[in-house]
Amino acid sequence: MRQNPDIEISLVGEEATIDLGAKLALNLRAGDCISLIGDLGAGKTTLSRGLIQAILGADTEVPSPTYTIVQTYETDPAPIWHFDLYRIESPHELIELGFEDAEDDIMVIEWPENAGSLLPSQRLIVELIFTDNGRSARLTGTTPEWKQRLNDIFDRS
C-alpha cells in the first residue's frame, strides 16, 4: 500500500529537478538516506547531481554510478554515498560494496528496491514520475523528523 506523499511538486525542465536536489542538499545530515524511485530517464541521476553540486560546487563532476554502482563524495557534514542499484541482482552484493558502512554517512540511492531488507527504514522517499508537463516529484518522509524537515524546506506547516 502506497503512502500519500507529504509534498508533491511539478518539475518543468531539467533545471527544476536540479533545483529540487539543491533544496534537499541544504538540509542533509549525517545518517540521512534519500531513496530515488522512478523509471529510466525520470531524473534520478539529475536530482542526485543537483544535490551533490549544491554542496561541492557546480563544477563537480557527478557521473551516473550505473556501472560503478557507487560513487563517494567527501562533504561536510558527512561523506555522500551515491548508489545506483539498477544492476544489483541480490542485496548480498551490497555488503561487499560497503553499503552498511555508509549508513552513518549520507546515502542517495537510485533503484532502492534492489537493496531489499538492507534499505534503511528511516529515509526520504523521492518518487519521480513522468507527466504531461514534464515530471513531478512526490516526497514522503518515513519519520516525523523527515516530515518536519520537508515542511521546513518547502515552507509549509
Short names for language-model regions:
Residues 25-31:
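Phosphate-binding P-loop
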Residues 44:
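Conserved lysine of the Walker
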Residues 62, 66, 70-113:
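Conserved nucleotide-sensing/catalytic segment adjacent to the nucleotide-binding pocket
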